[in-house]
């Protein structure tokens, strides 16, 4: 397993609702947040990488939509997830 696979399985294990859950909004948001954080570090070094920046903006938009869905469906889970990931100041 690569480092990315190990990190991904740790994130899934931490945020899954039940054993084997990989598709819940909580897991998807956590995985997107990890990828967004990695790309943010990438842009500190490669400021002119606009091709990847477009992908980053797409990921941020997708995370926002998932968070909106979760907020409407399960506000308690939304608040817990935001707190755990440290997304809101």
From Swiss-Prot:
Keywords: Ribonucleoprotein, Ribosomal protein, RNA-binding, rRNA-binding
Molecular function terms from GO: rRNA binding; structural constituent of ribosome
Domain of life: Bacteria
InterPro entries on file: Ribosomal_uS15, Ribosomal_uS15_bac-type, uS15_NS1_RNA-bd_sf
Cellular component, GO annotation: cytosolic small ribosomal subunit
Gene3D superfamilies found in the cross-reference section: 6.10.250.3130, S15/NS1, RNA-binding
One of the GO biological process terms: translation
Transmembrane segments: none
Pfam families: Ribosomal_S15 (PF00312)
Subunit organization: Part of the 30S ribosomal subunit. Forms a bridge to the 50S subunit in the 70S ribosome, contacting the 23S rRNA.
Function of the protein: One of the primary rRNA binding proteins, it binds directly to 16S rRNA where it helps nucleate assembly of the platform of the 30S subunit by binding and bridging several RNA helices of the 16S rRNA. Forms an intersubunit bridge (bridge B4) with the 23S rRNA of the 50S subunit in the ribosome.
Similarity comment: family membership: Belongs to the universal ribosomal protein uS15 family.
Name of the protein in its database record: Small ribosomal subunit protein uS15
Source lineage: Bacteria, Pseudomonadati, Pseudomonadota, Betaproteobacteria, Burkholderiales
